[in-house]
């Protein structure tokens, strides 16, 4: 099933290619152009991970490793002091529910642990029941706080934040 699938720390050109693909997939959305600009302006505070199947990017995740990130909201207790904030979990639709993202997540966790980080944090909207179940299964069971997240389209969402210790 996972065949020629490999996980990598993305290069800048891979990040640009993936953003261009997402923008195209979202009908040249201004919102996605804003996300691309934010991502590229924070390259020194983030590590972008990708899963490649036969060389094609099919999964991705971003680790925000510094509170100096200019675009992260609700930073307090989520990043710095050994904590990394995980975000932008994406899997191309046709590859969902096949284990690809789980393999990428394990790669991300292992890499961040090897770099000396002590815990991982993430945020999830309360309505995303399936994702909450997955994150709890992965060990994100320590509740940190609830906050509001404003998306590029102006929408505001309630987000619950959780932490997982890396042992």
Named regions from a protein language model:
Residues 24-54, 62, 68:
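Active-site rim helix/loop that mediates acceptor-substrate recognition in acyltransferases
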Residues 125-129, 137-138, 144-167:
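C-terminal "cap" of GNAT-fold acetyltransferases
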Residues 46-50, 60, 88, 121, ...:
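Short hydrophobic/aromatic beta-strand element in the GNAT-like acyltransferase core
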Residues 112-124:
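Conserved GNAT acetyl-CoA-binding A-motif
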Residues 1-35:
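Short amphipathic alpha-helix that is part of the acyltransferase structural core
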């Amino acid at each position: 099933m996972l065949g020629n699938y490999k996980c990598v720390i993305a290069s800048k050109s891979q990040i640009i290619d993936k953003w261009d693909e997402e923008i195209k997939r979202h009908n040249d959305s201004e919102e996605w152009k804003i996300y691309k600009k934010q991502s590229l302006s924070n390259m020194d505070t983030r590590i972008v991970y990708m899963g490649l199947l036969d060389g094609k990017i099919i999964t991705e995740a971003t680790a925000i490793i510094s509170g100096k990130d200019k675009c992260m909201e609700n930073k307090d207790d989520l990043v710095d002091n050994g904590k990394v904030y995980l975000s932008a979990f994406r899997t191309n639709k046709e590859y969902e529910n096949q284990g690809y993202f789980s393999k990428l997540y394990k790669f991300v966790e292992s890499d961040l642990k090897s770099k000396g980080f002590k815990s991982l944090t993430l945020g999830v909207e309360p309505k995303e029941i399936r994702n909450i179940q997955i994150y709890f299964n992965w060990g994100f069971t320590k509740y940190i706080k609830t906050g509001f997240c404003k998306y590029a389209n102006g929408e505001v969402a309630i987000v619950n934040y959780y932490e997982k210790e890396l042992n």
